[in-house]
Structure formats: structure tokens, C-alpha cells
Amino acid sequence: MTTIIMVGTRKGLWVGRSEDRADWTFTGPHHDMEEVYSCLVDTRGSTPRLFAGASSSWLGPQLRWSDDLGETWQETPNGAIRFPDGAGASVERIWQLVPGSGEGVLHAGTEPGAVFTSTDGGASFALQEGLWNHPHRAEWGAGFGGQAFHTVLPHPTDPDSLTVALSTGGVYRTTDGGASWAPRNKGIRADFLPEEQRFPEFGQCVHKVTRHPSRPERLFAQNHGGVYRSDDEGGTWTSIGDDLPSDFGFPIVVHPHRPDTIWVFPLGGGERRYPPDADARVWRSDDAGDSWTSYGEGLPDAFYVGVMRDAMCVDSHDPAGLYLGARNGSVWASADDGETWRQIAADLPDVMAVKVGVV
């Protein structure tokens, strides 16, 4: 089987393929000189479809797709992801592209903070107006990269349930198809607030949330400060980051076959956005965060760059392949559950997103 990797950068998209996860061939840049914050290898149909959320400094953001593994690309005239007339906003970037739980369903998280849903495979999208008009919106802030919904988690069996997260605002969930949304942040710390206000109802700087489809009630979150687990779909959260060298980071990834196995890539902190001691290490837990082990064989020392929230991902092989892209343009891959690594690309622009699929 062929493994496809998409690497979105600040200056275009690169597409790689490998038959053995050892030797890789890349093409690109696709969408040259456009920021690609989001990408997706959608393998649900008979023909795999690649999606890229690209932003041009001249023409703005556009969703593009390819049905021939990146050889040619198509787009919707005038943009598939647009605010309706009267919304008083324009899409600046597409931060997230996620397949939904139904046929042809695709979700997009954007900047400014909004979520859009397509039911026709990405040809058109509708704004989740219940979220856009949420009374908390006026108090949501912007993270260092802007205000955006960077996490969209469809429920694997309930199409009316959707969990989302933004920076800065926190985790929200709908159970009625988007008509209403409730904050789900109890137990998540907000270090930037005064001590007596550090556990608010909403407003946390959540960096990424993930879950395994076989355990939809269990969520894992990487916060601006803190790594957390929820066993009740975000109703309450428990810290699981005490054994890590730092609880600051961006990505958090769950194993495709073992729902208690997760990976994080700790950074030194908000003011030191490279790994502790500049040693690139992936930390893995095999017991849902109760304990952690670091792995770094093949990864560099003197690594003074970070890994963004969507720049680490996992494939569906067993053992699983783990992939990460760094802000110095290097891309790294592991074919043994993250234990040993090799570099598969170098000297690309600043990497914003890495996604894989097996076709």
C-alpha cells in the first residue's frame, strides 16, 4: 500500500509518497507562495481526494482538491468557504479540514473563529451559525497566530455531536447538530489569568484536542500550559502532564489502534518555543497519560525550532507511522510507533501542517 504525506508550509504544499515508509518521493511546491495551514488525505471514497486550504496574499483563502494525488487541482469559483452576506466577516485562513461522520461531510475551522460544514464533498460549505452567534464570542481572544478554530472532532457514531476548540476560547460541544454549543473546559488551567481566575468557564488557550474513534467519550488536550484527559467528552478534565519535561506544546496525537497511546512534542514554554534543552524528543504514553516515555533516536540535538499543532500526525499502519514537520522546514518520520526516526525532507519553508493517508 502507498502512504501519502501532505506537508503544508508558508510558501506552498509538498506531496510525498512511499511504498515502504523508508524511501520517499516528493512533488511541489503546489500552490506556490501561498500559505497552506490545513490539508487532508481523504480516503473515504473509491478515489482518494487530497484537500488543501491555501491562502494567497492577493486573492485570499481557497479550498482546493485533487483526485489524482496532487497532479492536478480544482477549486470552487469564488471560494467554497465563505461567510454569508450580512455576517460582517471574511475568511482569512482555513486552519482545519476534517472528514465528517456522514458521506460527503467535511468540516472546516477558520480564522476568524468559525466552523463551516459541507455535505457535498467540499464543493460548498455552510456556516455553523449557532457557534458564530454564540454569546461568548465577544470575549474570545486571539492566540499568537490569530483567533481560529483549530480543532474539529466529529463524533464517530452521532452526526449531531461535534466538539471544537479555539485559541483563545477553549473547548465547545454541540449535541443538537449545531443549534446550541456549550463550553467544556472544567479543569483546564488558564495560566495567563490572575491566580483566583485560572479555571474559568471558557477562555482557555487550548492548542489541540484529539480522540480515538473507538473511545469517543475520552478526549486528550494539549493546552498552552498543561496536558489533559477527559473521560466524559470534555465535561471535566484531569492533568496528565506532570511527568513531562514541559507541559507546553502544540500537537497531541492518538494511536490509530491503541486508544490509550498518545504522543506529544513538548516545548520549553511560551517564551521558549523549542524543546527543553533543545533536544528534539517525542513523548509517548501507553496508559492514557498516567506515565510517559521519551523517544528521540534519529531526531536532532540543538533543535531550536518548534512543531506546530497540526504538524504532527499518525498513519493507519501497524506499527503506526508518526510524522512531524518543524518550523525550519525539516520533516521527520518514524515507522515504529515513534521510537526511531529519520529525516525525509529538508529545507522546505516553515511547516504548518502535516497529514498522511494510506491508499
Question: What are the roles of these predicted feature ranges?
Answer:
Residues 1-359:
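Extracellular glycan-interacting surfaces
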